[in-house]
Structures are given as structure tokens and as C-alpha cells.
């Protein structure tokens, strides 16, 4: 490759061939080459325009090319992109304060992806546990959960599909049915250092537990001096109509993990703890080269300040209710096809009878992007800025898909 060749335009066929040739085959991709995004719209390199109701897997919280986010990242790139966490930066200090305020926590650790955040949370919980007793290392998580594909998060993830071929998994992990307090109670003892849950299961099918379930989990953790970890990688950052989903129930975790939407599309993640857990880790116990770098912190600061200044938390709650009601109209129209509509804010799931993939493909053919999870749940996690007019476009595409599939 000669200098400058990377900037030459490739056609669709070449792009796909080059990607398939060099990238490990770990993704199931659609034969589309995305080129440009603006707001809630994205264009492929053949000029086709799509309304995106998936937001890059709940990541693009401000949509595509939000001017505040673009300006913040561009200006920071022109000043300082990386210097390591051996030094202080102003933008990191600003981002830390914003995350602390949004999460309701006191201390923050920045990482690069949700799995890293969850790994760090479990690592802190293990150290907390064994400081109390050498056998206090058990971590309980839920069936149908998803916490990442790194080795320890894999053991905490409640899908057999992800476990096949990777045994023996990390020891000390126990799975229980989600929402079943008696099953959890049967596994709880003084050897449990943490319970790890999603306040709303995403990958498992957009399952919303009753508020009293989370309250009962909190009580069990308190009884056994176990830390309650909420994985808010997908549910956090205004996604559900609150800054973080735990705020719906009033059940505050001991550790909260975040990622996806917090950088508005820039890779950044981490976890947050109250002051009483701030010194479980000592210098050198945990860290990372890139976590909390200036570019990531600029993205975090711009994203959170924009969500706050534009009043998006309340707007998400309002638009989410409208969206859910429109989906319920489809359920009434197609009672044999739509089994359930559930979720909070702009994290919605429409469970269908039969496979969901044909519905996703039909929507794509009608220039709308949605996703299918758990085999038959159409997952809808659009940018937080989606308009009611764009919601109507998504619902119309789903209507066509349900009629045809």
C-alpha cells in the first residue's frame, strides 16, 4: 500500500471483500456499507437513506454528527489526544464531575467498553469480599443476562450459547432465573461478594422486572454484606427516561457500570462507586492505558452536557411512552403476531410469534433499521433525539413487516 492509498474510494464490492479477507469472522453483517450519518438518519454508499432505530446498538445517543459532540472531539484532538493517567487533564476532571452527578455516585473509573467496565466492577467486588473472608468470592448473576465476552464477564453471562467451547469458565459464578427472588434467596449466603444484574435485560429480550424485585435483591445483599452491581451499559444515560434505570425503582446499587451512550458514539465506559468503596482498590490494583483519555472525556462531557441542556431525559420519557403506545396499536392490529410490547423510555421490545429476523429484513427493505434479540424480540433503541415523525416512520415499517411476514 502506497502513501495515501487508504484515502482512495473503494466500491461496495471491494469494501466487503477487503473486510471479509482481513477481519476475524466474528460478526454476522448485512451486505451494506454505511457512509454518512446525520441526526437519526444514516446513508449507505449507494445513497440509500435509513431511519436508524438501533443507534449502533444503543450507542449513538445524540444521533449522528451532533454539532456539539463533533466540535468537542475535534477541538480536543487538536490539543491533546492522549497523555496517560499518570497526569491530570482539565477535560477528565470535567467529565468525572458530570458522570458523578449523572450516576449519583462519588468515584468513577473510566474504561473503553462495557465488558471492561463489568470486569472492573466484579474485580472490585471480589477484593471487597475476600477482605472480609477468604471464601467470600461468589458472584450471582441472572439467566438470559449479557455482561460481555471477556472471560469473567462470559462466566457471568446467562446464555449457554456464548459459553460453548470456552470451558471451564471462571469459577465462583452462579446463575439464577431473572426476576425470581426465591431462586436468588436460595443461593445467597455469606460467601456471596456480589449480585450482578441488568435493571432491564437488553440482550435477553428487553425484560423489565417489577420494582419490588430489585428492592428485594437490595435487601438480600444488605443482609449478607454483598455488593449490588447494576450493569447499566445499555440502560444508562437517559435511555429509559431517567439518567440511569435504577432511578425508576429507587434501588441504588453499590457499583454501577456504564458504556454505550455515554460517549455519544465514541468508545468509553467504566464504573462508579460511592465514597465508602473508593479505597477498595489501591494504586496499581487496577488501571488501563487508554481509559479516560482526553478524547473520550471530551465526548463524555459533550454528550452529558447536551443531554442535560436539551432536556433529553424528560423528552425520552415522553417520546418513549408515545412509541410504546404506537407499538401497542400494532399488537392490537396483529394479535396473532405480536405477543408483547415492553420496555421503558426508548429501550423497547416487541415480542413476536416466530422468528424476528424476517421483520428486521423487511424493515431494512423499507429503509428502517431495527434489531432482533433473543430470537423473536424486535429491539428498538433509537437515538435519544428521535422525533415523533421518525417514530411514525419506524412504526409504519413495522406495520408493513408484520403484514407481510
What is the predicted role of each segment?
Residues 4-405:
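Conserved N-terminal phosphate-binding loop of PLP-dependent enzymes in the Aspartate aminotransferase
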Amino acid at each position: 500500500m502506497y502513501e495515501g492509498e487508504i484515502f482512495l474510494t473503494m466500491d461496495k464490492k471491494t469494501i466487503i471483500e477487503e473486510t471479509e479477507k482481513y477481519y476475524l469472522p466474528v460478526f454476522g453483517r448485512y451486505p451494506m456499507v454505511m457512509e454518512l450519518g446525520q441526526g437519526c438518519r444514516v446513508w449507505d454508499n449507494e445513497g440509500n437513506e435509513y431511519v436508524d432505530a438501533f443507534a449502533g446498538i444503543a450507542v449513538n445517543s445524540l444521533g449522528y454528527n451532533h454539532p456539539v459532540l463533533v466540535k468537542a472531539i475535534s477541538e480536543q484532538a487538536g490539543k491533546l489526544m492522549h497523555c496517560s493517567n499518570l497526569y491530570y487533564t482539565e477535560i477528565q476532571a470535567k467529565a468525572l464531575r458530570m458522570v458523578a452527578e449523572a450516576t449519583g455516585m462519588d468515584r468513577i473509573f473510566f474504561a473503553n467498553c462495557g465488558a471492561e467496565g463489568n470486569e472492573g466492577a466484579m474485580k472490585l467486588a471480589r477484593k471487597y469480599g475476600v477482605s472480609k473472608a477468604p471464601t467470600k468470592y461468589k458472584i450471582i448473576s441472572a439467566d438470559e443476562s449479557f455482561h460481555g465476552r471477556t472471560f469473567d464477564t462470559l462466566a457471568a453471562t446467562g446464555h449457554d450459547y456464548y459459553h460453548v467451547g470456552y470451558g471451564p469458565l471462571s469459577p465462583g459464578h452462579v446463575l439464577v432465573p431473572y426476576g425470581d427472588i426465591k431462586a436468588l434467596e436460595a443461593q445467597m449466603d455469606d460467601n456471596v461478594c456480589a449480585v450482578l444484574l441488568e435493571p432491564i435485560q437488553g440482550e435477553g429480550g428487553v425484560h423489565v422486572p417489577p420494582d419490588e424485585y430489585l428492592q428485594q435483591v437490595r435487601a438480600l445483599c444488605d443482609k449478607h454484606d454483598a455488593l449490588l452491581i447494576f450493569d447499566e451499559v445499555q440502560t444508562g444515560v437517559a435511555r429509559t427516561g431517567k439518567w440511569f434505570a435504577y432511578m425508576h425503582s429507587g434501588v441504588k446499587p453499590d457499583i454501577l457500570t456504564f458504556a454505550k451512550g455515554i460517549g455519544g458514539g465514541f468508545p468509553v465506559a467504566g464504573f462508579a462507586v460511592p465514597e465508602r468503596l473508593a479505597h477498595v482498590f489501591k494504586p496499581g490494583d487496577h488501571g488501563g492505558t487508554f481509559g479516560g483519555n482526553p478524547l473520550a472525556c471530551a465526548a463524555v462531557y459533550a454528550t452529558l452536557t447536551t443531554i442535560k441542556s436539551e432536556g433529553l431525559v424528560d423528552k425520552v420519557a415522553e417520546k418513549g411512552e408515545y412509541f410504546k403506545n404506537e407499538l401497542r396499536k400494532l399488537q392490537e392490529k396483529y394479535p396473532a403476531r405480536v405477543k408483547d410490547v415492553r420496555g421503558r423510555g426508548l429501550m423497547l421490545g416487541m415480542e413476536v410469534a416466530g422468528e424476528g429476523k424476517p421483520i428486521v429484513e423487511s424493515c431494512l427493505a423499507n429503509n428502517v433499521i431495527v434489531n432482533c434479540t433473543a430470537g423473536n424480540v424486535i429491539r428498538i433503541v433509537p437515538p435519544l433525539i428521535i422525533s415523533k415523525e421518525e417514530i411514525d416512520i419506524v412504526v409504519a415499517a413495522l406495520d408493513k413487516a408484520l403484514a407481510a411476514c
